[in-house]
Amino acid sequence: MNEKLTKNQRREQAREQARLAREAEKKREKRNRLFLQGGIALVIIAVLGVVALVLTQSMKPAGPGPLNMISGGVTFSKDLEVVKTKALQDGDARKAPEQDWTKTPVDVTVYVDYMCPACGTFEQQNGDMLEQYVGSGDVNLTVFPLNFLDGQSLGTKYSTRAANAFSCLVEQQPENAFAYHNRLLSKEVQPAEQTTGLTDDQLVENAVAAGAKDTTEFKQCVKDQRFAPFINANWKSASETGLLGLAEGAQLINDPRVGDLQPADEPQRLRSTPTVIVNGVQWVDGRDGSLEEYILKIKGELDGSADKKKEDTAEAAG
């Protein structure tokens, strides 16, 4: 039989029970704080994860190809503005620019390799003229960068790196792409064959000299050769599948040294650079006169047709 507790013992027992209750409450509060902190931490981690994903996605290229080059090339129109296009997605075929050869502007497409000496000579002879006519809206110029001379840069793949840098700028800072294209082919900048070509840093420096900003995104795009696969596919498309946007029945030169034409019933493949297409037909230096004369002849014919159409319309209305 338990002895009856004294008053002091009952007091001590009550104190002990109160102490145990306080400790239990403290442990419960601590446990709740840990749960709360853990929950907040999980929320923070989740938010950071979303932010990181958004940032990562924003830094990725819009597709395997750059923006504004869905044909494989970039088209410059009036005031040297780039014609906007979506990026070429993986598995998609290149799409020729929309063309209407019944009226101006005249369409000029140039296939170039930035290490090609003849491309440099072509640009030095015709660059200012094309800039004038594109700026005025008389010509739309499409530049199609290639890399078939990679083997001429002592292992650095300069043609790919230069074409990639150009493509990076077309996507990120298109307002400076025309000047950059001209600069890469200028006598002061274009490297000779059998040299290593410009370094990646020098490619960025020359973009800045052409008016671009040396943003982290641009420099990373150049360094990573983000669009190298796109440039590789450009060469494969032009040299194997055949050129896009040719006029019906148009034939390209087969051997530039001879001047013979490719078979009409086969895809018209690129044989050399620069290859220049004007309103769907190849312009050949030495056969067709100067490029400016050739463009003005076509422009004159189109303007004459337009004027006659206006006269006929006016007579019919009268």
What are these regions, as identified by a protein language model?
Residues 102-117, 123, 140-141, 145:
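Short active-site neighborhood of thiol/selenol oxidoreductases, capturing the structured segment around
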Residues 3-44, 50-62, 208-318:
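C-terminal cap of thioredoxin/glutaredoxin-like
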Residues 120-208:
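Structural alpha/beta surface segment adjacent to cysteine/selenocysteine redox centers
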